[in-house]
Amino acid sequence: MIVRNTRHTALRLATLTVALLAVLGLVAACTKSSDAKQSDAPLPDAKTVIDASAASARALHDVQLDLSVDGSVPNLPVKSVAAYLTNQPKVSGQGDAEVTFNGTQVKAKFVVVDAHLWAQFGSGQAYQDMGLAADIYDASAILDPEKGIAKLLSSVRDPKVEGREQIGGTDAVRISGIIPGTALAGIVPKAALGDRPLTFWVQEAAPNNLVRANVGFDNGTLSVTLSDWGKKVALLDPKTAK
């Protein structure tokens, strides 16, 4: 009797195992089929994607920015920025930056409020008012619809969709093109730049947010990555924060 029950148990386990493997195989096949359909689908029209992305950028009020420089970029005193940016109810931002200040490379936390840049140069220290953000580097200008990422996108010449990629878990289309230096004013202020090669990634699904942009320079590359579009964050009060 014990032998029979053991055999029945083994048979049930074997049956369940086969069924489970069949289900897993079906799921895997469906996943591969879905992935294949997406990768085999025709690439979208570059202008259509760019127009939609520029419209989203103009309507964007909150975003997480990660900016980095590999090499050097003319007139840009920044090596890296990781920050939350907003333009409502007014232009503000906060985060961490590595910048050149008075000829020295320094790391600092910063807050931009009322057009002033406040910086903290060590944990527990008080924030110092460094003056007008525009006189140093105002990353929050990236959300300015007239000179930020919206301007960059709408100014791209000779755009070409090159393929699909995932950036930070977001399905995006990769587009290359040329960007005039004047369209970089919100990212590289005070720079007299000529045309620059640009590669950027736009969320393939609506609302087609800009995910990343790489701008080539003679001696370096500027990379801007955006995420958490529309997600609002509470700003610090630099007068009391430590």
Language-model regions, residue ranges each:
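Subset-of-secretome marker
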Residues: 2-5, 31-242
